[in-house]
A protein has these predicted regions:
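Residues at the C-termini of beta-strands that transition into short coil/loop
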Residues: 1, 15, 25, 44, ...
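Short, small-residue-biased leader/transition segments that mark boundaries at the very start
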Residues: 2-7
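Short beta-strand scaffold segments in enzyme catalytic cores
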Residues: 8-13
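A conserved active-site cap/scaffold subdomain adjacent to cofactor or substrate pockets
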Residues: 14-41
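Short, catalytically relevant binding-site loops at active-site mouths
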Residues: 28-29, 47-49, 79-80, 102-103
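Long, charged amphipathic helices and adjacent flexible linkers at domain junctions
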Residues: 43-63
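A C-terminal functional module that forms or caps the active site or interfaces directly
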Residues: 56-164
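Short, flexible loop segments at boundaries between secondary-structure elements
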Residues: 168-170
Length: 170
């Protein structure tokens, strides 16, 4: 199902001297290293846009996958900083993509994608949350940034693509 695509679509290249994680998923980079007994490199394309003319090594690395129709920006920072940013940017068509339980403190309409400390919930809720934003007619979305390690790396990678790599430090 689309809800579990964050976990199912993991890609690892064994074509070179060192394994390369091209697309993170449920099995973390650290777990792969333990199981394989060697270092696993993280492809630059996991956290950054491909450079002009650079070829994608795996499907899903090149395009803005799963993005809603709205413009999405990831906001990196504390919840207090996110809340202040939302207060100054709340307008018609602006939505918060936040963690479950945060919505009462936010001034804009909200769609949640799991609890802040539960990347497994985030992984299962992210795509349906993005579709919900479409259904509600969101024009602009400011997303809370998930963690960037372990299983949450997969969530962050998919959200980065939905945001076309737009990230703002708050």
């Amino acid at each position: 199902s689309a809800a579990s695509d964050v976990y199912k679509r993991q890609v690892i290249s064994l074509a070179g001297a060192q394994p390369v994680l091209l697309r993170p998923g449920y099995i973390t980079k650290e777990q792969l290293e333990d199981a394989m007994g060697c270092a696993v490199a993280l492809s630059d394309a996991v956290l950054h846009k491909l450079k002009d003319g650079e070829r994608a090594a795996s499907p899903g690395m090149k395009y803005k996958h799963y993005a809603p129709k709205a413009d999405v920006t990831i906001l990196k920072g504390s919840f207090d900083a996110y809340k202040e940013y939302m207060k100054s940017h709340c307008a018609d068509g602006v939505y918060a993509l936040c963690f479950t339980g945060e919505e009462p403190a936010l001034p804009c309409p909200c769609v949640t994608y799991g609890r802040a400390d539960r990347p497994d919930e985030q992984a299962h809720a992210l795509f349906s949350a993005l579709r919900e934003l479409d259904a509600r007619g969101a024009k602009t979305v400011f997303a809370r940034c998930p963690a960037q390690e372990g299983v949450a790396m997969a969530v962050y990678n998919r959200l980065l693509r939905a945001a076309a790599f737009r990230v703002v430090e708050v």
